UniProtKB/Swiss-Prot annotation:
Encoding gene (name): rpsR
Source species taxonomy: Bacteria, Pseudomonadati, Pseudomonadota, Alphaproteobacteria, Rickettsiales
Any GO MF annotation of the entry: structural constituent of ribosome
Protein name as catalogued: Small ribosomal subunit protein bS18
GO biological-process terms attached to the record: translation
Self-association and partners: Part of the 30S ribosomal subunit. Forms a tight heterodimer with protein bS6.
Organism of origin: Orientia tsutsugamushi (strain Ikeda) (Rickettsia tsutsugamushi)
Alphabetized InterPro entries for the sequence: Ribosomal_bS18, Ribosomal_bS18_sf
SUPFAM superfamilies cross-referenced by the UniProt entry: Ribosomal protein S18 (SSF46911)
């Protein structure tokens, strides 16, 4: 009765289970505690987001001129919207360039 078992099928099942557990183990490494938003401090020391401050806004723009996503900058959703609006206004008023030339 044991002669009828397909060994190739068992080997592939072992490989699948090992791969799945390896993926789970790797995922645990990437779950890190998220830091708070750098633009919203509870004690009131957070910078004010305005289009008049191109130095602050340029920290949230990539090298090619795009607005960096919130998952990269750790900015909360409401502050990300304010940043995007301020960057767009600053671009229209020529305080920030639309595209950075290399």
């Amino acid at each position: 009765m044991t002669e009828n078992i397909d060994t190739a099928n068992i080997d592939s099942m072992k490989h699948k289970t090992l791969k799945r557990t390896a993926n789970r183990a790797n995922k645990e490494v990437f779950f890190r505690r998220r830091k708070g938003c750098p633009l919203s401090a509870p004690d009131g020391t957070a910078p004010i987001i305005t289009y008049k401050d191109p130095d602050l806004l340029s920290k949230f723009i990539s090298e090619c001129g795009r607005v960096l996503p919130a998952r990269v900058t750790n900015v909360c959703r409401s502050k990300q919207r304010e940043l995007t609006k301020a960057i767009k206004i600053a671009r229209e008023l020529a305080l920030l360039p639309f595209v950075y030339h290399q």
